[in-house]
Every structure is written in structure tokens, then in C-alpha cells.
């Protein structure tokens, strides 16, 4: 499992990377956007998922409790799964 894997169920978004698995309830997600900052420096408290080096795209998932910053080279596929 090299990259970030995203699965969406009826109730939650499941993000898997390496040995980590994060469950985010869909009702808590407020916004999903592409982050154009380098290394997500504007979201200092965000949980970073993926390798910051060697990736060209960043996806910011804002929730009621916590923000998540995904480092990926597979932006289109991940956004399609999240927004499906």
C-alpha cells in the first residue's frame, strides 16, 4: 500500500495510508478543496497524510473537529471518490 486510498460509505469517509486508517463521519465534513499552498503551511494544525516530498497535489478536507491534508499525485481519483 504505497499511496493514499480513499473509500466512501454511506456514513463515513475512510482514508488509508501505510498502517494508518482514519474514519471521518460524512456529517462532520464541511469542505473539500484543493490546497495550493506549499506543504499546507496555512493549515498548521491539520493532520498530514501522505508524503509531502515527491507529490504535486494537496487536498484539504475541513471538518467540524479537525482538518486533514492529503499529499498525493492522484488528485482527480481521490476527489472523485470523496465527492461521489
Curated annotation (Swiss-Prot):
InterPro entries: PH_SunI-like
Top-rank lineage group of the source organism: Bacteria
Pfam family, one: bPH_8
Family the UniProt entry places it in: Belongs to the UPF0457 family.
Protein name: UPF0457 protein BT9727_3043
Taxonomic lineage: Bacteria, Bacillati, Bacillota, Bacilli, Bacillales
Amino acid at each position: 500500500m504505497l499511496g493514499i486510498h480513499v473509500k466512501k460509505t454511506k456514513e463515513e469517509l475512510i482514508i488509508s495510508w501505510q498502517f494508518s486508517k482514519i474514519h471521518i463521519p460524512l456529517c462532520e465534513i464541511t469542505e473539500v478543496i484543493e490546497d495550493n499552498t506549499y506543504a499546507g503551511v496555512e493549515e498548521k494544525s491539520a493532520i498530514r497524510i501522505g508524503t509531502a516530498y515527491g507529490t504535486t497535489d494537496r487536498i484539504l478536507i475541513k471538518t467540524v473537529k479537525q482538518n486533514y491534508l492529503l499529499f498525493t499525485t492522484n488528485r482527480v481519483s481521490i476527489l472523485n471518490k470523496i465527492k461521489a
